Amino acid sequence: MAGFIGKEQHSIDEKGRFMIPARFRKLLGDGKEARAKGAIFYVMKAFDGSLELYEPEIWAEKEKGLMSLSDFNPDERMLKTMMYERLDSVEMDRQGRIALPKDFLLHAAIVKDIVIIGANVKMILWSPEKLTSMIRESGTRFQVLAGRYF
């Protein structure tokens, strides 16, 4: 589905809103319909300090794994609790903006600007400073991983 590819930097307004890149909005439904209806996304706090934005169809596939976990197994129940604690739903307004909850902005250290990376079926949201730092610190690791998987 989706096919989000590319990277853009946008500003965050005083209400915690940012603009979904136009090229990504075009991939949502027929574009106009998604804006008129107010497209819903799921946003998750990632373990690396970024945020991940999923369309409902994509999140539903991921959620199947969570739903298969038992509430009677303490580890599985804890995992479900921790995953859902890191998740929220957000709606895109008619201007193509999404407002992120304050605790999500804090998690990702997003203040004035946001970097939106298209990662095929999801968008990864970073603070520009955190992204630059992560890339700088993992330069040789990237080479090793790319060599291993590509």
UniProtKB/Swiss-Prot annotation:
One annotated GO biological process: negative regulation of DNA-templated transcription initiation
Record keywords: Cytoplasm, DNA-binding, Repeat, Transcription, Transcription regulation
Highest taxon, organism lineage: Bacteria
Main location: cytoplasm
Cell compartments where the protein resides: Cytoplasm, Nucleoid
GO molecular function term, any single one: DNA-binding transcription factor activity
Pfam families per record: MraZ (PF02381)
Spans traversing the lipid bilayer: none
GO cellular component: cytoplasm; nucleoid
Residue stretches making up the SpoVT-AbrB domain: 7-58, 87-130
Subunit structure of this chain's protein: Forms oligomers.
Similarity annotation: Belongs to the MraZ family.
NCBIfam families with a match to the protein in the record: PRK00326.2-2 (NF001476)
Protein name per Swiss-Prot or TrEMBL: Transcriptional regulator MraZ
Organism: Chlorobium phaeobacteroides (strain BS1)
Upper lineage: Bacteria, Pseudomonadati, Chlorobiota, Chlorobiia, Chlorobiales
Gene: mraZ
